[in-house]
Amino acid sequence: MERIRGLEEYVKNKEYREALGLPKEKMENYELLAQGEYNINYAFTHPVTGKKLLLRVNCGSQMHLQHQIEYEAHALKLIEGSGRTPKVLYVDGSKKILDHGVLVMEYLPGHAMDYHTELMLAAPCLAYIHSVTIPESEEILIHPDNPLKAILEECEEMFKVYLESPLGDEEKKTYIRELLNLGWKRKAEIRLESGYQCCINTELNSTNFLINGEGKSNYLIDWEKPLFGNPAQDLGHFLAPTTTFWKTDVILTSEEIEKFIDAYIKAVGNRFKADMIREHTHAFIPITCLRGITWCAMAWVQYQQPDKLIFNESTFKKLNAYLDMDFLKNIRGYLEP
């Protein structure tokens, strides 16, 4: 816990301990569980209930939000009824005692999804989550009017970091610019019909799923970038090569993609109208690829900074792989007609 200045003192404060029903004196032990690019997670066992819990410390916001941890907690509360996401137990984004937002949630069982053997288990998991009705009065979740345009604008912001950096490769700057131009051209040719909207995750990497097996509860964690939007945006992200290749070396075949969409539509059943899901998913996949590439370009520059709080060696290696010209040329194939 020494990595986060003040965290050891934070978990001893009265408000935190009373809210979670912890003894006045700290008895629990916090162990580093995992870290992403914007959060560090610690696991601990509640000394009174014996339940395993997760302490999440927020270190940044992809969405440039002032209240990132509250936003994530709000989304989790909205979809708690799905039974496929962690229950929020405590949230503090005040930053009065600690310079970071803090979230405590239940610890869920399971292992990271294996694309080769467990791909289809993600379909009913997503269907459960997407089927949760969001109240009409909901105003906190961000709701882009034009999701494809919103993704491309985000891509432009991220690419700008690489483009303006003297560390960036000039050939790659030119090539990524060409890919973005293809993305804008493709977006102009696509008209997504408005339809069912729900809370979507937008970050469906294999490690964000906790798999327990067929006939058991499988979960989706890591809700730092949720939106109110088209469920096909989640499918497009989940199936895109820039997603599957991230933590593995898997790129799904066209047949695997179609089978997954079939399984998802079947899992949805009559809970909401899913007749346009396939068409919309294929509209999101190539644009999602651009998001993956431009995020890697931005992150590559950030990883050159000596004061970066979170540094993942495996991530740095993947950043270089995604910016390899052969990989970029492969992505071009998804953007060209």
Language model features: what each stretch is:
Residues 7-24, 134-202, 212-214, 326-335:
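An alpha-helical support segment within catalytic cores of ATP-dependent transferases
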Residues 31-153, 157, 166, 189, ...:
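ATP-binding pocket architecture of kinase catalytic cores
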Residues 234-271, 286-306:
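Active-site activation/catalytic loop segments of kinase-like enzymes and analogous catalytic loops
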Residues 33-46, 50, 54-55, 184-233:
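Active-site acidic catalytic loop and adjacent metal/ATP-binding pocket
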